[in-house]
Regions:
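Cytosolic regulatory regions of ion transport systems
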Residues: 1-215
Length: 215
């Protein structure tokens, strides 16, 4: 369980609060709007109404005590930038800030953000890949050229083993799990045999995935 400071409780921030709650973390939520603060009360440990660009207010929260500080402000980039910078100055261990454009992302990283999340960009990539490909069921966007994909098992692989298809050698794609009857099995070995109805979780580059799975 971690202690999280969440600043900015719009739609994105509220969903972050809900998921952190479901994961069992302690969350202090902050927003300048009382209505937004009240909306997340069922999901957070503590909540405060305040201006996150005010150094005295932020300092009173005990920034150094949090494992991570998430700046989810999406409607005011100036406030997001100032809050990010102040958090770092006050000794935040980890600052994760939301960006809404490539330019915002660069400025946030230069002004104290350890990591930046870009929901619109990430969702756009997910949508483009997921719905333009016949065999990709889901995917997780990682940094760089490599991503994790869940794909349908090609019919020609039914009855074959991981070692026999050897897509790691041919395409640089690693099979990291097999889904059977709705459950993911991560204990994949060279002798693991594929069965009809399986889906597989793979790590690789999209262009190689296209070649391997004829996407």
């Amino acid at each position: 369980m971690k202690s999280i400071l969440l600043i900015g409780l719009g739609r994105f921030g509220k969903h972050v609060a809900m998921h952190l709650h479901n994961l069992g973390h302690q969350v202090m939520a902050v927003d300048s709007t009382e209505e937004r603060v009240n909306a997340v009360l069922p999901y957070v440990t503590e909540a405060q109404i305040g201006d996150s660009t005010n150094e005295s207010f932020l300092s009173s929260l005990g920034i150094r005590n949090f494992d991570a500080c998430i700046v989810a402000i999406g409607d005011n980039f100036q406030s997001s930038l100032e809050t990010t910078s102040l958090l770092k100055e006050l000794g935040a261990k980890l600052v994760v800030s939301r960006a809404s454009s490539d330019v915002h992302q660069k400025f946030l990283l230069r002004n104290g953000a350890d990591q930046v999340v870009y929901p619109e960009q990430q969702l756009a990539k997910w949508t483009a890949i997921r719905f333009s490909s016949n065999h990709i069921l889901d995917f997780v966007n990682l940094e760089g050229d490599y991503d994790i994909y869940e794909v349908d098992l090609p019919e020609r692989w039914v009855g074959m083993s991981v070692g026999e298809i050897d897509i790691r050698k041919k395409y640089g794609i690693n099979i990291i799990a097999v889904r059977r009857n709705g459950t993911l099995d991560f204990s994949v070995k060279p002798e693991t045999v594929f069965k009809d109805g399986n889906t597989i979780l793979v790590l690789g580059q999209y262009r190689e995935l296209q070649k391997c799975f004829k996407i």
